[in-house]
Amino acid sequence: MSLLKHMSEFEKLIKKLDALTSSANTSCSEFTNLLIALGFQVENCGSAGHKIARHPAVSLIEYPNYNCGHNKGEAVKRPYIKKLYKFVKQHENAIKEHMK
């Protein structure tokens, strides 16, 4: 029963992430919170607004990144959301397993 509960949570989150790929205005905090709910560790990197999304279930040399812009409350551009969505779909099994 526990597996079904976690899978439905994962499915709900992935569906929300998919919806954001066509959204015109996704706030940085909404996007970041969704990634954290999927188990990502989000780190600020160097310049203003740039973030790296690492997932403990996936070992890579280079992880996907995104930009929140330079102003607080700025929207995340769709190409970044699509890149992270593709990453989650590529590593779906490992991320699902990690969420158990």
Q: Where are the regions a protein language model picked out?
A:
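Negatively charged, low-complexity tracts enriched in Asp/Glu with abundant Ser/Thr
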Residues: S2-L38
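A short, structured beta-strand/loop element
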Residues: L34-C68
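C-terminal basic regulatory modules in eukaryotic proteins
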Residues: S2, A19-A24, S29, P64-K100
